[in-house]
Amino acid sequence: MLDQKTPELGTFGFVPGSAGNFFVGDFDLLLTSAITEKASVLSEIVLGEGDAQSFDVDLERVLFKYDYNDHVKTSFGRYHTGIGYYNTAFHSGKWLQATTDRPLLMEFANDGGLLPTQAVGVSVTGSIPSGSLGLNYIAEYGSSDTVRPELDTPDREEDENNGNHINVGLFARPDWAPGLQIGGSFYHDQISDFQKGPNVRLGQTIVNAHVVYTAHGIEFLSEGFLLRHDYEQNGPAYNMPAFYTQLSKKFGHIRPYFRYQYINANPASIFEDVGLRHGPSFGARYDFNPNIGIKAQLDHTLRKDLPDLNGLQLQLVFAF
């Protein structure tokens, strides 16, 4: 439910329907099969509701995986990019999240998110011999054809026409602090800005740093990003900061949580529909048992030169 008719919610992009409505969330199917001791196949298929009770089928991931050892684990196919922490920790599963939705910055591009969240190519990850420091790496090379609907005009899409990307990341999971992860990543590709012309290209660089702690019933997630769009042929360059911080603590069956997110997208960039927006989310999740839960979340989003958005989301989640 929203306090205005525009079907936009600052933390999710937009939702189907009008100011207050019911809608079916994602139906996520995860299929895995071992081929040999080291080779396997993974696929993730999501059925999501569109407008007017129509449904879309998304092949979120399909991977041929080969784990040579703990230091070299390869995946070939369609994957969720390892930009930061959230995208590869929660994937498409609403069940896995404490909140009803992903931070807008980390939302999938087809739901209005800013990042190239999916790609086709090769991903390699593994541990680095580092003793108690627990270092791990990730390296990816592939194509991410990002098409995102604009938040203020959902029927209008922004096709970034991405070139091949490279993404590298490093993170530590020290033995002396179970549940702690500290790391970062660097992503680069080239994209198009068709609003400025059919041949306008720019370099896109995304730098991430994150600190995560998940232990003793506590979930603390904090990620900061710098998105840089550098136009070719002596064009402008835009540096756009963004972050989110989320904290929750489980008490028996209930997990109250708080999240604050911030995005400062340059209005002259391809993210002119996003602009400057920030605000808190408050909520709680109640798990009836290990397979059924319900969530309630209140969002307040401040937007530059636009009215504030207030939203209430209620969500039933289950796993089987």
Kindly give the residue locations of the regions a language model identified.
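Transmembrane beta-strand segments of Gram-negative outer membrane beta-barrel proteins
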Residues: M1-F12
